[in-house]
Structures are given as C-alpha cells and as structure tokens.
Amino acid sequence: MLSLRNATEADLGEIRRIYEYAQDYMIRSGNPTQWGHFYPSADLIRSDLQKKVCKVIYDETGIHGVFALFDGAEPTYAHIEEGEWLNDEPYVTIHRLAGDGRVHGLFQCAAEHCKLLSPNVRVDTHANNTTMQRLIEKNGFKRCGIIHVMDGSPRIAYHWTAR
C-alpha cells in the first residue's frame, strides 16, 4: 500500500534518482521538451525541501514517487486561455510529480491526499505528456484550458472540485 509523507534532506538522493528516471522516460515517450534533462534543478528540489512542499510516496520497499504540493494561488494560473477554471475558490496545486516506474497509483495517491486538504485541486501538464493527461483525467480532473508557465511555454490546465 502506498503512503505519503513530507520529504527530508535524507531523501534527496532518491528524489534526484526518481526525477532522472522521469526525465529519461518523458524523452523516450515523445515528450523531450517538458523537462529535458535539466528540470527540476537540484536547487529547485532543495528549495522544495526547505519550504516543506516536497512530498514522497512510498511503500515497504522504498520511495517510488515525488511531487511538490503548494497551497495558495499559483501565479501562472492567474491567466487561462481557451477556457476557464471551475471556480475561483482557494486551491492546492500538484507540481513536478514523478515516479520511478516500479509501482502504479502514484498520481492517485497524490490526488487523494490533496483532495483531503482542499475542495479544489489544480494541476497542469505538457501537451506531449499523454501519460499524465490520462492519469489526471482518470482521477476526476476536468480540462479547463491553457496556462503558460514561467518560461512562457503552454500547459494544459486541469481542476478538480468537490463542489
């Protein structure tokens, strides 16, 4: 059974290994531009750890997944094109979800945790990341439109609401 906890500095090696696996997987799967081999950077991972937003998903055999969970307004979500958010209520955001390829259910575990924290959860992904799109939609999120991340590149924006 999968569990979730706050990541610690002791997890840094496993977290980096998981992100490296995910980078390679995305490139092999036809999504070479979302992360490439450079995102997330070591500095960004350390920042997530320091801010206590980095979460790990694990079972009795070890850590299998990682993501960042943010509570509050996401600046890149302020403007959405080709649609609209389901509501303007406070929300949490899932960012940088990655897995090691050894277990299934990582997004479901992260989403269920977030749904307990907030009646509104948002997430975005690249148009070429069809694996993530399927997982997001399978977990009840609605496609709302297109947002642009800090570098200006577009992402498909999703929103789940309990209401």
Question: Predicted regions span which residues?
Answer:
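A short helix-loop-beta-strand connector motif used in the catalytic cores of GNAT acetyltransferases and
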Residues: 43-56, 73-75
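Conserved GNAT-fold acetyl-CoA-binding loop/helix
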Residues: 23-43
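Conserved catalytic-core motifs of GNAT/GCN5-like acyltransferases
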Residues: 124, 142-156
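Conserved acetyl-CoA-binding loop-helix of GNAT-fold acetyltransferases
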Residues: 99-116, 134-138
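Conserved GNAT acetyl-CoA-binding A-motif
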Residues: 116-128
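A short beta-loop-alpha structural element at the N-terminal edge
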Residues: 3-17
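Conserved beta-strand in the GNAT
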Residues: 56, 62-72
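Conserved acyl-donor/pantetheine-binding loop and adjacent beta-alpha core of acyl/acetyltransferases
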Residues: 68-102
